[in-house]
Design a protein with these regions (language model features):
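Active-site flanking loop/helix segments enriched in acidic
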Residues: 71-75
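Glycine-centered secondary-structure boundary/capping sites
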Residues: 78-79, 100-104
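Elongated alpha-helical scaffolds
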Residues: 79-97
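Core of compact, soluble alpha-helical bundle domains
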Residues: 1-70, 102-150
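General helical structural elements
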Residues: 78, 96-97, 139, 150
Length: 150
């Protein structure tokens, strides 16, 4: 099991450029998005964070800061948070495809897939949660201003 994790991390590190290139071909990026370059940087950063998580160098709480950063960027860009979810799932699919190339045994595969799911579920949950907290603040501020001037 540890060997599968090690090989997966090694493959992702050595093939990072190819991985990101494949991912970029499938993600949603709006032309008007002021953070469109950040999307790729965030993806690269998350790939690195994922490999650190698999190697148990970081825990899930440590990705919450990047979740907040991404939520703020999506809010500022005025794009639907669903695009982030879609792009994240495309990255997850790319990692799963890489795992299957390693041909792990059933039990090894199950354990690694559980870790992959946990990482991405945590990332998506905290990003969407942060996004909606920001939206709630924005809407509250809007109505407060509206009351003030009406």
């Amino acid at each position: 099991m540890e060997a599968t994790k090690r090989y997966l991390c090694l493959y992702l590190k050595e093939s990072q450029e190819k991985f990101i290139s494949n991912w970029k071909k499938r993600i949603l990026v709006h032309e008007h998005d002021p953070y469109k370059d950040e999307i790729i940087k965030n993806g690269t950063h998350l790939l690195h964070a994922f490999t650190m998580y698999i190697r148990e160098e970081i825990n899930l709480q440590e990705i919450e800061n990047i979740s907040k950063k991404i939520a703020q960027e999506r809010m500022d860009a005025k794009v639907n948070i669903a695009d982030f979810i879609y792009n994240t799932n495309e990255g997850k699919k790319e990692i799963l495809n890489t795992l299957f190339l390693l041909n792990p045994t059933g039990q090894e595969c199950k354990v690694v897939i559980e870790q992959i799911n946990l990482f991405f579920d945590h990332l998506i949950y905290h990003t969407v949660y942060s996004y909606y907290e920001l939206r709630k603040e924005y809407i509250h501020s809007y109505y407060e201003l509206k009351k003030k001037y009406n």
